[in-house]
Amino acid sequence: MSKNEDLTPSLFNSNNRNNEDKQENDIESKLQKRQEDFSNEENFSKIKESTMSNELSLGQNFRNKIFMQKRLKQNMITETTESLKNKLTIPLDWFEKCNNMNVQLSQFHEIIVAFRTQDIKQKYLGLVGIRKLLSLQNSPIQELIDVGVIIELIALLDNSPAEFQYEALWCLTIIASGTSDQANSIVIKGGIPKIVKLLESSIEELKVQAVWIIGNLAIDSYRIRDSLIKEKIFEKLLTILASTNQKQLIRQCTWALSSFFRVKPVPPYNLIKKAIKMIARAMVMLPIDIEFLADACFILSFMTEHYKETIKDLLELDIISNIIKCLDIDTQYIQISCLRVVGNIASGNANQTQLLIDRNVLDYLKKTLFNQKKTIRKESAWILSNIAAGTQKQIETLIEQDFLLTLSEAIEKDDPEIKKECIWAVCNLTSVENEKYIKKILDQGILRIICKCLEMKDAKYLAVCIEAFSNLLAFGKKSNPAGPNPVVLEVEKMGMFDILEKLQYHPVEIVYDKILKLLENYFEVAYIQ
């Protein structure tokens, strides 16, 4: 049989499925590494910027483009081909044979010949063959571009049967997950207008696949992303998200929208401000959908970090409770994104912080402060230190809920950088003015905690601890003005004077000045050498 004669799926008999399984495992490992890298930063002030930069540069990182391709395979094969069967123009048995066949790279020429024939069955066989070639571990994306396949795939998007449009879209989606030049070839060959047209298709799976290509293109580079913005595609995605109840389409639109935020420079606020409302609507519809929430929470985290105006919008939509509840989802990238949203709100005014407390955020922070992932613990400690720097009511709430004991446990067991944030929060608790609450933290052992912290080498935190110590001593003096200071007596009982003596000779001026002032105000000279 010549190569121009009919091909049958049985000729495509490689061990490709084993290769695809191996590729899925390789991609899973790479994704896991990307997630683990989240927890290896050393300085908290850098971690948010560093991690955000990593997220923003996904389009330039081929490893993460493979992750997008992985998502394509997992979701699309099982979900969309079933419903396409009702719209077929080719025999069902041929459709199934084509989709079940295996291919190998050595059949490249054979597949191209089949694709370019006029026979509809052979053409579909070749088209599926191209998609399967693209799904191989060593995907021949460039070779297919070099033989001119892209322009033919784009042509199929116009007025072709649904199964042809779907396969062509799928092929273009994988090509868009390649290098920047490969992705850009779709733009250069005029693919964008035809892809955008399919966003309006009445066939949901075509719409989903078109959305997917847009996400892969937007994540590639700011030039392609900005060309999509110019074509008002961001707004079109928002329109779809606002009008659909289909879960898969909501997931895909949210992911595609998130791609617009993952490339620097950040898009303008006046473009993206409507996204919050659409994401809020979707969060109500899919409150526990992990795939959707991963992208939705990333968008909200990014927006509250880079566009402070969106915090007000977020609060007005009243989805803070939904975001806080996501802290209970045991998925690292969802928890981190939600903690960043909470942290960005908590770093605002007192009313914003109070709203978080009213939505029971403290219940969740008690758990996330002891999460296995260091990054999550660090974010949680930072948020608590911000809340502890709030109003008297907010400090009292922390004390009422026994956060001194919670923070004390973290200080005792955690890494130094997390310990420092917790120390900051503990010291802030001493600024409470109500006698009832000062007595409570004294009873819970705050002097012991501060005593241990006075042995730290970090001058900044030493100064904070001395200030907190002064607050407690001032309370003791005020509570018994005519007699001995009960806090001084407790300090004496604990044997803290050796530490105080050493601090008199500290080389850092701010520590030296604060300790001298403390000793002069609250301790008799006889106690100090």
Name every feature range the model reports, one short phrase each:
Residues 110-112, 152-154, 194-196, 236-238, ...:
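Buried hydrophobic core positions in alpha-solenoid tandem helical repeats
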Residues 118-131, 160-176, 202-219, 230, ...:
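Alpha-helical solenoid repeats of the armadillo/HEAT superfamily
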